[in-house]
């Protein structure tokens, strides 16, 4: 009974609509494409299983860049394509990375992908499991924070008041645009260099 429950739990986790679960054979051809992958990518499993690799639904420019970066990092030649997606996992190295997936309709979205090599009893790789999550909301939140920070800096630096802040020793750490205009010093000339008394 415990094994049946464990099997049911594994099935429920694997079929979660919140994660794309893509299992491939050793050559990278998709063998399993779960409900979450169907929802995120717009393909039916029948459209991709035994037909394409995860590289075919990934941004080709990112695959080239990833292959170059991994080749430099690991001092070996790594081909763009599926090999770039699974190279670390094939060597037993934990691999979680950001990647742009391409949906069936051609639209793109950022994903965080975790890759694991699947091995048989003799420790021979028989395939790979790629678990992905849609990273769109986090990316949008990061962009909103960057824009908010830029807006705050713009307001702070265009203010008609001077704002000067020092550290515990009295050395200037903040010197805004208003202070530059009123006092005639550039921030670069005073920050981390002098105290207001100087």
Features from the language model and the residues they span:
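PAS/LOV-family and closely related PAS-like sensory domains
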Residues: 18-130, 164-198
């Amino acid at each position: 009974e415990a094994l049946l429950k464990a099997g049911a739990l594994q099935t429920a986790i694997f079929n979660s609509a919140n994660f794309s679960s893509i299992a491939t054979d050793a050559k990278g051809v998709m063998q399993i494409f779960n409900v979450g992958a169907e929802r995120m990518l717009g393909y039916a499993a029948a459209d991709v299983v035994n037909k394409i690799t995860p590289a075919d639904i990934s941004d080709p420019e990112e695959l080239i860049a990833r292959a170059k970066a991994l080749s430099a990092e690991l001092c070996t030649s790594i081909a763009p394509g599926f090999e770039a997606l699974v190279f670390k996992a094939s060597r037993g190295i934990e691999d979680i990375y950001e990647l742009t997936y391409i949906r069936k309709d051609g639209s793109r979205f950022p994903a965080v992908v975790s890759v694991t090599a699947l091995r048989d009893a003799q420790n021979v790789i028989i395939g790979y499991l790629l678990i992905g999550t849609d990273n769109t909301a986090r990316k949008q939140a990061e962009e909103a924070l960057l824009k908010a920070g830029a807006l705050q800096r713009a307001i702070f630096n265009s203010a008609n008041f001077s704002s000067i802040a020092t550290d515990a020793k009295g050395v200037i750490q903040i010197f805004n645009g208003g202070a530059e205009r009123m006092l005639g010093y550039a921030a670069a000339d005073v920050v981390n260099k002098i105290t207001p008394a100087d």
